[in-house]
Structures are given as C-alpha cells and as structure tokens.
C-alpha cells in the first residue's frame, strides 16, 4: 500500500501554502510559497493557481490502479523534497528476444512548481535523479497533469494511459519475437 511506502521512505509529510512577502513586508500578489509542514522548509514559490497535491493523495490512487501482485519497490525525494517519486514493480514479465523485461510504474510529484504529476511504465528501476529522468524520457507512454484546479479529476486518464502502455509492451514483445523468428538469407538481405 502506498501509505506504508511513504511512511517507510519518510515522505509522509504535508505541504502547506502561505503568502509571499517582500523584505519591506508588502505581500507579493499572484504567488504562494509551498512549505513542508514538519520543518517549515520552503519547497518552492508557485503561482497562486497552483493546487497542492499531497504525497498521500498523489500516490493513493495507485493502490486501486495497480491491483493484485504489484509491489512498491522504492520511493524517495529529490532536492530536499521538492520532487517526490515512488516506484512499483508490476508482476507481469515480458519476454523479448529471450530476455525477461520487468516493467515498473514510476510516479512523480513536484512541490516546487517545476513539473506536473507524472505516471509512466518503464523498464528502468529508479534510484536517483538520473534514473528518474531516464525512466520518464524513455517511457512509451507518460500521463501527466499540471497542478491546477482539475488535477485530481484527471486521475482516470492515468488508468487509461497505463493500460495503453501495458498493451504496447505486450505488442512490442510479440513483434520482436516474430522478427527474431524470421530467417534471412544473404540473398534476401542484399536484395
């Protein structure tokens, strides 16, 4: 369950928004500060239309989405909590050219205004910023939603995207295995 994974990873904190003030004491209109509740760290300055999606909310919808047999593998934060992510291992394996490919689902949420909530299927096991970038860049399908008014209502789209990614991986495996089974002669290659 995602809640337990968040607790074990130390990501079970909340984000609060506060007004932003200039050194003169004047409120700066149009901006808010995203603050981590446990230590009052500023995670980012965002526009006033930015809607917070708590870590628990961002990852809770995945519990039902993932279903039986899915295991949360790892979770972490980058840049002092500005970006949080969670990785789940899917029990299904794809055999491609005789190699077992184990797919993962990576979930990413930012609190600094730098990015949307993203969900992607990937064969890359995320452990740091570089592998997170690789996983999201190399994914065949990525669902994302900006931190705006309707972000939570768009979660059904994530389910659809992941179903398409699953279908893509299955089809890719079949196509590669079919190509591998075809015999080519030198004559056919040179033609």
Where are the regions a protein language model picked out?
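Intrinsic disorder/low-complexity polar-acidic segments
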Residues: 60, 66-191
């Amino acid at each position: 369950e995602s809640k337990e994974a968040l607790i074990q990873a130390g990501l079970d904190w909340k984000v609060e928004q506060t007004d932003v003030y200039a050194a003169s004491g004047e409120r700066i209109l149009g901006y808010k500060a995203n603050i981590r509740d446990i230590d009052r760290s500023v995670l980012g300055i965002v526009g006033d239309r930015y809607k917070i999606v708590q870590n628990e909310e961002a990852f809770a919808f995945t519990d039902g989405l993932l279903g039986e047999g899915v295991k949360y593998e790892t979770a972490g934060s980058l840049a002092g909590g500005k970006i949080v992510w969670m990785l789940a291992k899917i029990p299904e394996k794809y055999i491609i050219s005789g190699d077992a490919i184990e797919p993962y689902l990576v979930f990413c949420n930012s609190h600094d205004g730098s990015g949307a909530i993203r969900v992607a299927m990937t064969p890359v096991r995320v452990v740091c910023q570089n592998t997170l970038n690789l996983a999201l860049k190399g994914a065949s399908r990525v669902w994302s939603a900006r931190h705006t008014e309707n972000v939570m209502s768009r979660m059904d789209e994530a389910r659809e995207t992941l179903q398409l990614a699953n279908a893509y991986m299955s089809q890719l495996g079949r196509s590669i295995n079919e190509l591998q089974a075809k015999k080519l002669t030198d004559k056919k290659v040179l033609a």
